Every structure is written in C-alpha cells, then in structure tokens.
C-alpha cells in the first residue's frame, strides 16, 4: 500500500470509529446508564429504616447504584471493582469542571502534577487513620510498592522477607531490586489454609536473620484471600528494628483499616477494587518517621524538599485529577453506608458461599479462623480446569469468576452481591459439575 492509500485507510478507519462511537452513545442502554449517572450528584441511598426492616432489600436497593446489568453476576472484585453511579458522576463533574480551562489562578492547570491535593488527601487520611502529610496519591498498589522497593537504602546481601502468596505487583519490584543491586528476597511458605495467626507469626520469626531489613507482606493475599495478622507482624518487625511494608491492595473498602493502629511503616492500596473507586486511583502511606528514609522513584520539582513530606512522592507531572474526584466520592459512599456494615456483609456472604462450596466437595483454602477471612473465598476443585469453567460461566451464564491454574476458584463477595445471585452461581456450578461427570 502506498503512502496515500495508507493515510486514506487510516482516515477511513477513524471516521468509521467515530461513527461507531456515535452509534454507541445513541444506544438506549448506554444512554440510559449515563443519564442516570448524570441526573444527580449522589443517587438516593436506602436508609437505616430499610436496613433494620429487611437487610437483603437494603442491599438490593444499593445494587441499583451499579452499571452491572441485572442479568450479570460479578464475583471478581479481587481483580477490579465496578465504580457505582455516584463515583461516575464525580468523575464526570471533575472533567466538566477542569476541561473548561477556567481556573482562576493561571498556574492551576499547568501545575496539576505538582499540587498538594489536600482536598483529596484529607478525606482519605481520615478514612484510613493517618495524617495527610503521610499520604501520597499514586495510581495503585503496584506503583506504591515499586516506590518502596526502589526508594529504600539497601545494600548487597540485605534481606527482604515476604510470603509465597504475594501479587506480582508486590513481589516483582523487590526481585528487580535483587537483580540490579544484589539484595536477597526470602519467602515463607504459608499453609493452605492458614490455621491461625500464631502459625504466620512463627513462620516469619523463624525466617528473620541479622540481615533482614524489610518485612513485606499482603494484608490480604491475592492467592487465598487470607487476612494476615498485620498488626502482629508489624509489631514483630518493629521489635527487631526491621521496617514493615504492607500491600493492602484488597483492604480499603473491604474491611475497616487504621494504619496507625497497625503501626506499620508503609502501606499501599488499590481502592479501585473494594472501595470501587476509579481505576488509577491508589495511595502510598509512609509513617512520618520513615518518610526521609525513602527516596523518590519518579523525580520532578520538589523531590528534595523535606517539608513536603509524602506529598513529594505524588509529584509525577500532569495527572488524572478527575479520578481523584471519583475516589473522594467513593470514600463518601462507603462512609454513608458504613464500613462496619459493609465488612459484616462481606464476611457473611463469603462465609455462606464457602460453606456451600465445601458441601459440594471443594477443598477450602480459607482459614478456619474467622478473623483471618473476609470477602475473598478460594477453593480447590480438581479435576475442574479453571480456564474452562471461567469461560463457560461467562459465555453461558454471564457469571464472572476468577481462579488459578489448574483448579483454584477465587470468589469475591462485594456488598451488592445478593443472595439470589449466589444461589444462581451455585446452580450454575452444579450444572457444570453434572455436565463434566
């Protein structure tokens, strides 16, 4: 194809794409969804009276805040959540306001990536129990974990201790540091299931050596969903002069969190999972006493200004500020519902689906200790192959699940998951097993 033909093809494709987008925006379902999202700042939430009278009806009303079609069942918040209408509305309002280019201060827009963003850090700090000066707004836990792994002064032979159930976004930053700078990554092997907190603490304590500099672990592991005894692990680290860094990707929005009570040195999270904040909104918490021990990974103006505290870690240049509007709305929504209520719902739904799966012969990887479980259920179901059942569930039943090779199923139970949805999933699982037997 000559240059003129190529450019013509590109132009044609662009026109076709624009026409397709226009047709999509005219589609009644999509138009209706966005009209709903834009109709009001915060769609009316069910009240305490309904919750007291009929809990399931209360959650059914909250389910209407989400764009997930009524005939679909979503059991994969462990990967990514669905942002509800108040969050989508806030993101739209953020774009609607900022894209006018009408900021009163001429410097406001071009230095977006250099602002304190206190209007977003303040509510987050209150939500997780810290000061805003200890918070940097980053894109997700992976980015925060990379800042930690790259930013600490570690020497050849220094050891970082973690579990064998870390997400790649938590483990790989340390592996990169090991390959480049000669640190040593050591792992403790967690049993499946973890019987109790003491087992975890003993495994870590036995693995600590005089060269251990950092204990890094997932507050809730991505593999089995076990809630590790974070407060006790951080206390163990502190008692031995070791830094503690916690990957809390799953925690914010799933269960109550107070980083001060955990007494950790560093904490990261991905609120797009269980808080259902916009994708690309995350945070890095660094205890004030540790901030000056962490070097910037991404550098621009302000990186060497100690008075900025953790703010300097969020200075990356132009950023998606409307996503932060959405995260603020997600915090407000969680606060309006109540994290205690949300956590209780998460645990009840997960315990129910776990019992039902075990009745059907699944091998539970969830801890028998209720304190070490929340809203992720992992079971092993050999000889079922996860890739096959994932595809079958989605293509034939519109049910989204997640798992791991060869036969692990991981089920997430967000608060808007209804009992009738769980029953439908279980019926589909029974049908699949019968089909394969």
Where do the protein language model's features map onto the residues?
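Twin-arginine (Tat) signal peptide motif
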Residues: 1-7
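Pyridoxal 5′-phosphate
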Residues: 7-437
